[in-house]
């Protein structure tokens, strides 16, 4: 169930679903697994807000366990494509593709709430049953290319070397807010809508 908010206007009352009301304030909620439908919705909202006024920041709140690499990179590419700065605010968790998206916010405008967590790891993939060996080799090669691409993005976003990212992402690498700040993925820890 999506909450509805009532707003008083000069013409009377107007009801909005909560996400539409937040969008009026340039707030986008990226929650749950990153997948194509969710990514298309996020991209449409980014493009809409940028077309509306590209001199104002967009606020992207993130609570995601990650998901599809292609869907996540489509969001990141759109964040980089538009003129508006995209502030990222991690609440809860930014894991896997969630980390790639969150760390790709405008430099100096990447935030995290104090009890949120970050996770980096190598990308996962599979070919499913009944796959012939040559297709498995192709899938493995593509997975290596994807890993290199994601490690480059994380390196650019954190200031860490690709070698360090590769080492840390070999297994699940969890970070709390202070560790994420020290690592370079965020710029500030936010508490009570104030920077800490």
Swiss-Prot record:
Subcellular location: Cytoplasm
Keywords: Cytoplasm, Hydrolase, Protease, Serine protease
Signal peptide: none
EC identifiers of the protein: 3.4.21.92
Gene3D superfamilies: 2-enoyl-CoA Hydratase, Chain A, domain 1
Chaperone among keywords: no
Pfam families: CLP_protease
Cellular component aspect of the GO annotation: cytoplasm; endopeptidase Clp complex
Active site residues of this protein: 96 (nucleophile), 121
InterPro entries assigned to the protein according to its UniProt record, in alphabetical order: ClpP, ClpP/crotonase-like_dom_sf, ClpP/TepA, ClpP_His_AS, ClpP_Ser_AS
Family annotation (PROSITE patterns): CLP_PROTEASE_HIS (PS00382), CLP_PROTEASE_SER (PS00381)
Reaction equation(s) it catalyzes: Hydrolysis of proteins to small peptides in the presence of ATP and magnesium. alpha-casein is the usual test substrate. In the absence of ATP, only oligopeptides shorter than five residues are hydrolyzed (such as succinyl-Leu-Tyr-|-NHMec, and Leu-Tyr-Leu-|-Tyr-Trp, in which cleavage of the -Tyr-|-Leu- and -Tyr-|-Trp bonds also occurs)
A GO MF term: serine-type endopeptidase activity
GO BP terms: negative regulation of DNA-templated transcription; protein quality control for misfolded or incompletely synthesized proteins
Membership in a protein family: Belongs to the peptidase S14 family.
Subunit structure, as described in the record: Fourteen ClpP subunits assemble into 2 heptameric rings which stack back to back to give a disk-like structure with a central cavity, resembling the structure of eukaryotic proteasomes.
Purpose of the protein: Cleaves peptides in various proteins in a process that requires ATP hydrolysis. Has a chymotrypsin-like activity. Plays a major role in the degradation of misfolded proteins.
Protein's name in the database: ATP-dependent Clp protease proteolytic subunit
Annotated source species: Streptococcus mutans serotype c (strain ATCC 700610 / UA159)
């Amino acid at each position: 169930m999506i909450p509805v908010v009532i707003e008083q206007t000069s013409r009377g009352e107007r009801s909005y679903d909560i996400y539409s009301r937040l969008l009026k304030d340039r707030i986008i909620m990226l929650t749950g697994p990153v997948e194509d439908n969710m990514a298309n919705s996020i991209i449409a909202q980014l493009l809409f807000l940028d077309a509306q006024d590209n001199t104002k920041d967009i606020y992207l709140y993130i609570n995601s366990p990650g998901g599809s690499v292609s869907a996540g990179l489509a969001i990141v590419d759109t964040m980089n494509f538009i003129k508006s700065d995209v502030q990222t605010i991690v609440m809860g968790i930014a894991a896997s593709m969630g980390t790639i998206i969150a760390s790709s916010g405008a430099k100096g405008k990447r935030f995290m709430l104090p009890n949120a967590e970050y996770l980096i790891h190598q990308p996962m993939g599979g070919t499913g049953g009944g796959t012939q060996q040559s297709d498995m080799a192709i899938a493995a090669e593509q997975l290596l290319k994807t890993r290199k691409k994601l490690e480059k993005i994380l390196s650019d976003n954190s200031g860490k070397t690709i070698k360090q990212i590769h080492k840390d992402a070999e297994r699940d690498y969890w970070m709390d807010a202070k560790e994420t700040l020290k690592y370079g993925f965020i710029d500030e820890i936010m508490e009570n809508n104030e920077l800490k």
